[in-house]
């Protein structure tokens, strides 16, 4: 057990090119069963930037209380491939984040586009066209366990092509996490460091919450659908009078309630398959491998 939390925050993330991103949404809920709420961007008529998310997290954590914060991106890369970036075999996820930052420091707004273009790191990525012959996209243990559990089919962080690609979001997320840790000593990133008494950042996969509750692969298209999902997560429903929600809104709202719901299961912090490599290098999707 890692103790109790005072708030649950979920971020639907984006690693896209550009200045602002319709794909970013943030939701928050407190303990108990109250409905999650969407957090408006600082310029309410304009979408979030990644830097604004960093600033908001820094501010929100500074308001006090202990938050469990889930971000929908891979926190690391498969080290069967990523280990080749380092001369020493003792490299950790924090070494990887430092490397990504050095390579991408000229990319604005935490973008990670320079990394897969760099000749020393490009070979593991599928970036365009047909899949190169012989290319095996690395996967982390958590992605394999998630598939075996039947709680989703997360893509490899080395895939940078197609609607379901997650690689750009992962690289941007690593830059975000690194920057936040440099600003604050009262946050921890699970499972890489001790979390007791600190606000804790975890990697999330929104579909997992729906799969674990029995909602399955159905889309959440309406407020009525969303409130049905929230009920399965022991959460009150949201006000259904607003315009039709976006996929990003529903992912964030479901995930905030899902974090609160899943956190009641003590086994979520010591899931089956969470080995030494995952704890030191590759990370883990929160909820994967946890007992039902």
What are these regions (language model features)?
Residues 2-9, 13-292:
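RNase H-like (RuvC/DEDD) metal-dependent nuclease/polynucleotide-processing core
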């Amino acid at each position: 057990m890692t103790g109790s939390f005072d708030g649950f925050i979920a971020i639907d993330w984006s690693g896209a090119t550009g200045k602002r991103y319709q794909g970013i949404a943030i939701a928050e809920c407190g303990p108990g069963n109250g409905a999650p709420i969407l957090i408006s961007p600082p310029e309410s008529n304009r979408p979030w930037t990644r830097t604004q998310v960093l600033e908001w997290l820094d501010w929100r954590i500074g308001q006090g209380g202990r938050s469990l914060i889930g971000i929908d991106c891979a926190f690391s890369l498969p080290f069967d491939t990523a280990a080749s970036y380092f001369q020493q075999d003792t490299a950790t996820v924090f070494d990887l984040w430092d490397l990504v930052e050095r390579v991408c420091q000229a990319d604005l707004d935490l973008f990670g586009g320079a990394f897969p273009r760099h000749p020393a790191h490009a070979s593991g990525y599928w970036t365009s066209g047909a899949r190169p012959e012989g290319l095996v996209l690395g996967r982390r243990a958590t992605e394999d366990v998630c598939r075996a559990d039947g709680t989703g089919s997360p893509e490899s962080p080395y895939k940078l092509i197609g609607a379901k690609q997650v690689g750009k979001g992962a690289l941007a997320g690593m830059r975000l996490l690194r920057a936040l840790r440099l600003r604050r000593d009262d946050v921890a990133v699970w499972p890489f460091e001790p979390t007791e008494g600190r606000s804790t950042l975890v990697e999330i996969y929104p579909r997992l919450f729906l799969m674990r509750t029995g909602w399955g692969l159905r889309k959440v298209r309406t407020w009525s659908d969303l409130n049905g999902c929230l009920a399965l997560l022991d959460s009150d429903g949201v006000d259904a009078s607003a315009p039709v929600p976006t996929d990003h809104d529903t992912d964030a709202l479901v995930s905030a309630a899902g974090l609160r719901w899943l956190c009641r299961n003590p086994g979520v912090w010591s899931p089956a398959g969470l080995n030494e490599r995952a704890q030191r290098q590759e990370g883990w999707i929160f909820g994967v491998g946890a007992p039902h």
